[in-house]
Swiss-Prot record:
Taxonomic classification: Bacteria, Pseudomonadati, Pseudomonadota, Gammaproteobacteria, Enterobacterales
Disulfide bonds: none
Localisation: Cytoplasm
Name the UniProt record assigns to this protein: Malonate decarboxylase acyl carrier protein
Main location: cytoplasm
Length: 99
C-alpha cells in the first residue's frame, strides 16, 4: 500500500461532509470534510504503487475544470481507474455543495 499526500490551493468553499463509494466495492471510497482554509489537503492510501504522478495529474485537471474546494479529502483506492476516481471525487464535492 502506498501513502500519498497532496495539497492544492482552494478556489471555492463548501460546507459539511460527504462520502462516495464503498471500500468493499472493489474500487475506492472518498471522504470529504469542508474546512475554513485556503487549501485542499488530500491523503490517499492506494494499492497501486508509484501512482503519485497519476493522482497529481487527476487533481490538476479537476482544478482546471471546476477549481478545488477547501478542506480535507481522504481516499482509499483499490485500483480504481482514473475515470472512476474522478467520478467519486466529483460526487463528494457535489454532495457537500448541497449539504
Amino acid at each position: 500500500m502506498e501513502q500519498i499526500t497532496l495539497s492544492f490551493p482552494a478556489s471555492r468553499a463548501l460546507s459539511g461532509r460527504a462520502l462516495a463509494g464503498v471500500v468493499g466495492s472493489g474500487d475506492m471510497e472518498v471522504l470529504y470534510t469542508a474546512a475554513q482554509s485556503a487549501t485542499l489537503n488530500v491523503q490517499i492510501t492506494t494499492s497501486v504503487d508509484n501512482s503519485q504522478a497519476r493522482w497529481q495529474a487527476l487533481f490538476d485537471r479537476l482544478n482546471l475544470i471546476n477549481g478545488l474546494p477547501a478542506g480535507q479529502l481522504i481516499i482509499h483506492d483499490f485500483g480504481a481507474t482514473p475515470g472512476v476516481a474522478r467520478i467519486r471525487i466529483e460526487q463528494v464535492f457535489e454532495e457537500a455543495a448541497h449539504a
